[in-house]
Amino acid sequence: MARSVWKGPFVDGYLLKKAETARGSTRAEVIKIWSRRSTILPQFVGLTFGVYNGQKHIPVYVTEEMVGHKFGEFSPTRTFHGHAADKKAKRR
């Protein structure tokens, strides 16, 4: 079920403060965040966030198309190594 419209998008408070200070500074640096559940807002466009995936921070550059999605969607937590090869088919 989707979030109620009257509640508005969820964003952690510290994330808004970090983005605001990054907008004010001239240095382009990665903003490390652990909040994968936060919604990407229009004021985040053009910033780079390091989204934590459980092991390391994955750099995510926010574009217009990402607005409305969650940060966790752009930082995969699992690595797919492919399915195991069939041993019978390999011998032939």
Swiss-Prot record:
Pfam families assigned: Ribosomal_S19
One cellular component term from this protein's GO annotations in UniProt: cytoplasm
Keyword terms, alphabetized: Ribonucleoprotein, Ribosomal protein, RNA-binding, rRNA-binding
Gene3D superfamilies recorded: 30s Ribosomal Protein S19, Chain A
GO BP, one annotated term: translation
Record SUPFAM superfamilies: Ribosomal protein S19
InterPro entries noted in UniProt: Ribosomal_uS19, Ribosomal_uS19_bac-type, Ribosomal_uS19_CS, Ribosomal_uS19_SF
Function according to Swiss-Prot or TrEMBL: Protein S19 forms a complex with S13 that binds strongly to the 16S ribosomal RNA.
Family to which the UniProt record says this protein belongs: Belongs to the universal ribosomal protein uS19 family.
Cited PANTHER family: RIBOSOMAL PROTEIN S19P FAMILY MEMBER, SMALL RIBOSOMAL SUBUNIT PROTEIN US19M
UniProt-listed HAMAP family: Ribosomal_uS19
Protein name, entry field: Small ribosomal subunit protein uS19
Classification of source organism: Bacteria, Pseudomonadati, Pseudomonadota, Alphaproteobacteria, Hyphomicrobiales
Gene: rpsS
